[in-house]
Regions:
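Polytopic membrane enzymes that build or remodel cell-surface glycoconjugates and lipids
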Residues: 1-489, 495, 524, 531
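Helix N-cap/loop-to-helix boundary motif
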Residues: 87, 440, 512-515, 556
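Intrinsically disordered, low-complexity Ser/Thr- and acidic-rich flexible linkers and loops
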Residues: 226-229, 507-516, 558-559
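Structural marker of alpha-solenoid helical repeat scaffolds
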Residues: 438, 472, 506, 510-513, ...
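Terminal, low-structured helical/coil segments at or just beyond the last alpha-helical repeat
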Residues: 516, 527-561
Length: 561
């Protein structure tokens, strides 16, 4: 039986192995520093989280700082600062422990819902060890990804408990976990959709032909028991019509709608939607979304050339769009055709659906895609893969030792790849140099390599990368700023003024996000004007610098009330 002491011990032992392997794999992050992108905004230069008091709590629940509303994430960082101050290792280890906890929760949720120990363990192991998730764990500012996933998994577990015996109290627990997840990061906004998939499989709450993917009578053999060895009594609840199950999700959908409104407002307030520098047309965003679905699939199968930042293409080639569309349609057709294996359809739709908020239809930032967006979506692919391979091996009557050996070899290969990917996070320079190398024509990466070299005292090398960044994307203001500062410091005030004027022109439409950059630019421009004897323009630049400082949103997190 599923609840026998022997099986419980096996599950506990596997959970321990899973957690231990995950922590051991990610333990090197204990020696890694904060990275330049967002870690300062979230921790090192954010005095609001550096005192765990009532003012910080109020600020966490009322701010849209960093273009997000995620109060539990802010409180998590505040607690970490209370424990570790600015020792980056402690913050990193918290992320590693949360990732290990999420892996164990995923194992537990799948096991309780399906009755399969081995398959559930393999899904959780792929989730824990796949290198695509390095970004979510090694980046301290991405704590929000880990927290939201934890609450989503708890909501899934609570929903299975509710489905076994629907009660208001049990449903309320699902709502609570969902609210906590949204207060950590709103990317789990697709939970109601995932729960409908959960109803279809593995809970099988959808009654007969009411399902949008109802099987013909001749195709329905073996569905309810895909030959599970044991099923918990708690799992068997009443079947309902699809309409009733959809109605059941209305409170969750209301929370999703509220979160969407808050998120859009926060992103627009922070200048993330459309970016402060460039916006892309809807056609380009649609084309990029289709291509990126295919790119995510390729990285799930062969996780090579992973990068911190993938630049958004200005033009997407129609051939790429056509091939990606054909692939997605083909895989969808296969999943529907083989829907008697419900896990295939559920896994595929999980992948497609959970990526919708992050696929770029609404532009948030300047990236085409991001490894961190795979943290939730790849779970669907892992489910389809593990259940599909296990059923195939069973049909072929392959020895369990062969399946176990192949699984172990795959996990070891992933651990090696993850360990290597983790080393790129050992410093800003290593991270951005790798990103520039594997992406190509990446102005943001070239600029960040330059900044990293500049901090290391290698100014001449840094200037080459700033020039590369400016050549790749003439609309990016940061390299012009750094080139201007270099000219100013090396006695070329006229050249410096030209660079500073470019920065101001490129950020003319800024709504406050780049006020800090503009303030620094005007300050250096004033010094350059003074060096040329132009006191009138120097005074004007000084006045404008002061005005920009009052618009600088980072000022809010660097001062206390």
């Amino acid at each position: 039986m599923l609840t026998s002491p022997t099986r419980a011990w096996i599950v506990a032992a596997l959970a321990f192995v899973l957690a231990a392997a995950t922590v051991a794999l990610y333990f090197p992050v204990h020696h890694y520093p904060f990275v330049s992108l967002n870690d300062a905004e979230y921790v090192t230069q954010n005095v609001r989280i550096q005192q765990l008091d009532w003012d910080s709590i109020v600020w966490s629940f009322t701010t849209f700082h960093a273009a997000n509303w995620h109060p539990l994430t802010w409180l998590s960082h505040a607690l970490d600062y209370h424990l570790f101050a600015l020792a980056a290792g402690g913050h990193h280890l918290t992320n590693a422990l949360l990732h290990a906890l999420n892996a164990v929760l995923l194992f537990w949720v799948l096991w309780r819902a399906t009755g399969y120990v081995g398959r559930s363990f393999m899904v959780a192991a792929l989730f824990a060890l796949h290198p695509i998730n390095v970004e979510s764990v090694a980046w301290i500012a991405e704590r929000k990804n880990l927290l939201s996933m934890m609450f989503l998994l708890l909501a899934l577990g609570a929903y299975r408990w509710y489905a076994a015996r629907p009660r208001v109290g049990r449903y309320t627990l699902v709502l609570i976990f969902y609210v906590f997840g949204l207060m950590s990061k709103p990317q789990i906004i697709t939970l109601p959709f995932l729960l409908l998939l959960w109803d279809y499989w593995p809970l099988e709450r959808v009654a007969g032909r009411s399902s949008p993917f109802a099987l013909r009578q001749s195709d329905s053999r073996g569905v309810s028991g895909e030959k599970r060895k044991a099923i918990s009594e708690e799992r068997s609840g009443e079947q309902r019509s699809f309409g009733w199950l959809l109605l059941e999700k209305l409170p969750l959908l209301a929370l999703s709608a509220a979160s969407a409104v808050i998120t859009v407002h926060a992103q627009r307030s922070g200048g993330a939607m459309g970016g402060a520098l460039r916006s892309y047309s809807l056609v380009v965003r649609l084309e990029n979304a289709v291509v990126c679905y295919a790119r995510y699939l390729s990285k799930a199968i062969w996780p090579a050339r992973l990068a911190f930042f993938y630049p958004h293409p200005v033009i997407v080639h129609l051939r790429q769009v056509a091939m990606a569309s054909l692939l997605l349609l083909l895989l969808t057709a296969v999943a529907v055709a083989l829907r008697r294996h419900r896990y295939l359809l559920v896994g595929w739709l999980w992948f497609l659906g959970s990526l919708v908020p992050m696929i770029g239809l609404l532009q948030v930032g300047g990236q085409a895609m991001a490894d961190r967006y795979a943290y939730l979506s790849f779970v669907g692919l892992f489910i389809a893969l593990c259940w599909g391979v296990a059923d195939w091996a069973k049909q072929r009557r392959l020895p369990n030792s062969c399946v176990a050996g192949a699984s172990l070899a795959l996990l070891l290969a992933l651990m090696i790849a993850t360990h290597r990917q983790l080393t790129y996070w050992s410093s800003d320079l290593a991270l951005w140099a790798h990103t520039a190398q594997v992406t190509g024509n990446n102005s943001a990466a070239e600029n960040m390599v330059g900044e990293s070299l500049q901090k290391a005292g290698r100014a001449q090398e840094a200037m080459e990368h700033f020039r590369n960044a400016a050549a790749i994307d003439p609309l990016l203001p940061y390299p012009h700023y750094h080139l201007g500062v270099y000219d100013e410091e090396n006695g070329n005030p006229q050249d410096a003024i030209l660079q500073f004027k470019r920065v101001i022109a490129l950020t003319q439409s800024d709504t406050g996000v780049l006020a800090g950059l503009r303030a620094n630019t005007f300050t250096h421009m004033a010094s350059s004007y003074e060096a040329t004897g132009d006191t009138a323009n120097a005074e004007r630049a000084t006045r404008l610098a002061s005005e920009e400082q009052h618009r600088d949103w980072s000022f809010e997190t660097n001062t206390r009330p």
